[in-house]
């Protein structure tokens, strides 16, 4: 599914990734653990195509296709997803409208708002989110736990082939960890891959 070969990447002329090799097959969950500053989030961003980082050497192969030079939106259309460590707030854009736009771009299907609400209702219930959660502006005024639940909600609705979770477990209390963990477990299937980034040694 995903194969990273001798990946070197830098930002502002400073090399951060120095020859990373990784292979993820369908149905597998891989964890990248390490202290802050060790390059875990850099790897997640480089795999997803963040233009801030420059790949100086190596290749990223997804489902047999070399995507090393592909932009972020193309990777999303191929079925890749990144749950951010620090999700941004977007005032004026509701969660349901963001999901509607994302699905339209990825699947080339024009969902109505009603169709989208039906699609997200079950996932919201599983994550312990209230019915009006989808009408809130994206991450505006959200607690840390709500931001992480929103990332998992996006994961559930967008249903990618490969999900990269960048420290989705950080900053959560015990209940938040349980809800997010259960949400990810329910989404895991034999045809999907997961790359989990964490600084927790567990």
Predicted regions and their residues:
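ABC ATPase NBD Q-loop/coupling interface
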Residues: 59-75, 139
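H-loop/switch region of ABC-family ATPase nucleotide-binding domains
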Residues: 197-199
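ABC ATPase C-loop
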Residues: 155-156
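Helical segment within the ABC ATPase nucleotide-binding domain
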Residues: 177-190
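Walker B catalytic motif
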Residues: 167-168
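Q-loop/switch helix immediately C-terminal to the Walker
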Residues: 86, 92-106, 119
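The feature captures the beta-strand-to-loop junction immediately N-terminal to the Walker
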Residues: 33-35
